[in-house]
Amino acid sequence: MSGKKRTASSSRWMQEHFDDHYVKLAQKRGLRSRAAFKIEEIQEKDKLIRPGMTVVDLGAAPGGWSQVAVKLAGDKGKVIACDILPMDPIVGVDFLQGDFREEKVLDALLTRVGDAKVDVVLSDMAPNMSGTGGVDQPRAMYLVELALDMCHQVLAPNGCFAVKVFQGEGFDEYMKAVKEAFKTVKTRKPDSSRPRSREVYLVATGYKL
C-alpha cells in the first residue's frame, strides 16, 4: 500500500471520528470514550447497576464504562476495573493493569474482589483486530468466554452480566452458555454502536448458581 493511500484512508477515518456525534458529546461531558454511552443506554433499559453495588469492569481502559459505573454505584458501592492498557485514575475505582488472559492477573483481580460476591460483571473487552475474521473472531470469543468464567467465580445469586460479543462463529454457542447461567438474556445494539460493527451486547440478569 502506498503512502498516499494510507494517508487518504487515515484522513477518512479521522474525519469520521471527529464528525462522530458521540465522540463530540463524550468530550463535552468529560467522558473518556464514546463507549460510555453504550453502558448508559444499557443501564437505561436494563437497570443493572444500583447504589451500593459492587461492579467488576473488564476491558476498562480508557475508563468510560468505569466512569458511568462508579457514578451509579455511589459512595457505598465499589468498582474494580482491569485492562491490559494503562488507565488514568478515577475516584472510587480500584484499577488493576494486566492481561486478563494471564492466571496471575486473574488471581490479583480475585484478591481485590475478596470474599464478597459481585453484583455486576461488565466486559467491553476486544482483541486487537487484524482484519482477518478467521483470526479475530476466535480471539474475541476467547475473551468473552473468560468473562463468563469470571461470572461463575465471583457473581452473586441473581447478579447481572453485560458483555460485548462479535457476531460470527461461536456466537450461538456462547449465547446458549449464557442462557444456561442466567434467567434472562437480551441482545442489545446501542445507538452509540456504529451500525457497521458486528458488535452486540448480551445483557444477562438473574445469575443462577
UniProtKB/Swiss-Prot annotation:
<dbReference type="InterPro" id="IPR050082">
    <property type="entry name" value="RNA_methyltr_RlmE"/>
</dbReference>
<dbReference type="Pfam" id="PF01728">
    <property type="entry name" value="FtsJ"/>
</dbReference>
<dbReference type="InterPro" id="IPR015507">
    <property type="entry name" value="rRNA-MeTfrase_E"/>
</dbReference>
<keyword id="KW-0963">Cytoplasm</keyword>
<comment type="function">
    <text>Specifically methylates the uridine in position 2552 of 23S rRNA at the 2'-O position of the ribose in the fully assembled 50S ribosomal subunit.</text>
</comment>
<keyword id="KW-0698">rRNA processing</keyword>
<protein>
    <recommendedName>
        <fullName>Ribosomal RNA large subunit methyltransferase E</fullName>
        <ecNumber>2.1.1.166</ecNumber>
    </recommendedName>
</protein>
<keyword id="KW-0489">Methyltransferase</keyword>
<feature type="binding site">
    <location>
        <position position="99"/>
    </location>
    <ligand>
        <name>S-adenosyl-L-methionine</name>
    </ligand>
</feature>
<keyword id="KW-0808">Transferase</keyword>
<dbReference type="GO" id="GO:0008650">
    <property type="term" value="F:rRNA (uridine-2'-O-)-methyltransferase activity"/>
</dbReference>
<feature type="binding site">
    <location>
        <position position="63"/>
    </location>
    <ligand>
        <name>S-adenosyl-L-methionine</name>
    </ligand>
</feature>
<keyword id="KW-0949">S-adenosyl-L-methionine</keyword>
<comment type="similarity">
    <text>Belongs to the class I-like SAM-binding methyltransferase superfamily. RNA methyltransferase RlmE family.</text>
</comment>
<feature type="active site" description="Proton acceptor">
    <location>
        <position position="164"/>
    </location>
</feature>
<feature type="binding site">
    <location>
        <position position="65"/>
    </location>
    <ligand>
        <name>S-adenosyl-L-methionine</name>
    </ligand>
</feature>
<dbReference type="GO" id="GO:0005737">
    <property type="term" value="C:cytoplasm"/>
</dbReference>
<feature type="binding site">
    <location>
        <position position="83"/>
    </location>
    <ligand>
        <name>S-adenosyl-L-methionine</name>
    </ligand>
</feature>
<dbReference type="InterPro" id="IPR002877">
    <property type="entry name" value="RNA_MeTrfase_FtsJ_dom"/>
</dbReference>
<feature type="binding site">
    <location>
        <position position="124"/>
    </location>
    <ligand>
        <name>S-adenosyl-L-methionine</name>
    </ligand>
</feature>
<dbReference type="InterPro" id="IPR029063">
    <property type="entry name" value="SAM-dependent_MTases_sf"/>
</dbReference>
